């Protein structure tokens, strides 16, 4: 199963990605977490890992990868990856692993003027389409904020889309767009309502498709502290356990 975690900036995508990854691993799954956000500097910290090397460098860097991709789109026989890709076949020097969870970072913006993130989005799209999973393997993609990754076709390689909704008008509006696009793609779309109290929970549930909501997560001091300090997140939430049960039915 390949899961895309999406939503507006600051809604809690990285925290939910971390909590889901750890719960899937506890249930005996082999988990690959993909950091698909070129601006994200906290996901690896929440997982308690070092930041891996940029995977796009394995393919020659941004310019070389885009050159190969353009040649492929022009009809030339170009292999972006050598043979079939599986989690076990990924180059270990581009992975960090802990407690049955592997972390892969597609690529980051490191310097002024180095160019846009389009090559990283294209690589993530092609990688997800090419990655073949075995039984009990799960991929969780922490996407960049917003919906540009939908325009790049990233979710075409995923089975499930989970939109994280926080107590903001923007987040509610975005969830409706994600639901619309995801259903046109024929993907399963779910919502996780995050960072709420009783009042904001009710307001959100009145304004989204409640049938898509698989968890409502209240404000949590441990999650907030880990996110603020860049510390490993080990919170155990019954809501996350329920999400994993739903996804593995």
From Swiss-Prot:
Binding site for ATP: 7-14
Natural source organism: Methanocaldococcus jannaschii (strain ATCC 43067 / DSM 2661 / JAL-1 / JCM 10045 / NBRC 100440) (Methanococcus jannaschii)
GO cellular component, one term: cytoplasmic side of plasma membrane
Pfam families cross-referenced by the UniProt entry: CbiA
Keywords: ATP-binding, Nucleotide-binding
GO molecular function terms noted in the UniProt entry: ATP binding; ATP hydrolysis activity
The UniProt record lists the keyword RNA-binding: no
Protein known as: Uncharacterized ATP-binding protein MJ0084
């Amino acid at each position: 199963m390949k899961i895309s975690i999406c939503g507006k900036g600051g809604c809690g995508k990285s925290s939910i990605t971390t909590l889901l990854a750890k719960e899937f691993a506890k249930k005996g799954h082999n988990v690959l977490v993909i950091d698909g956000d070129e601006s994200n500097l906290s996901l690896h910290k929440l997982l308690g890992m070092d930041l891996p090397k940029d995977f796009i460098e394995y393919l020659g860097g941004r310019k070389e990868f885009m050159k190969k991709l353009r040649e492929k789109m022009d009809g030339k026989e170009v292999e972006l990856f050598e043979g079939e890709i599986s989690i076990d076949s990924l180059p270990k020097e581009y992975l960090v692993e802990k407690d049955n969870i592997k972390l892969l970072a597609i690529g980051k913006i490191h310097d002024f003027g180095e160019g846009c993130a389009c090559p990283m989005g294209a690589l993530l799209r092609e990688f997800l389409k090419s990655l073949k999973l075995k039984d009990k393997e799960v991929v969780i993609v922490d996407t960049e904020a917003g919906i540009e990754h939908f325009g790049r076709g990233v979710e075409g390689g995923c089975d499930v889309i989970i939109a994280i909704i926080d107590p903001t008008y923007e987040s509610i509006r975005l969830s409706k767009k994600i639901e619309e696009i995801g259903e046109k793609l024929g993907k399963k779309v779910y919502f996780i309502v995050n960072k709420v109290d009783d009042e904001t929970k009710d307001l959100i549930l009145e304004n989204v498709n409640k049938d898509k909501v698989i968890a409502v997560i209240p404000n949590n001091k441990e999650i907030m502290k880990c996110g603020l300090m860049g510390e490993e997140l080990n919170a155990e939430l019954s809501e996350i356990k329920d999400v994993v049960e739903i996804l593995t039915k």
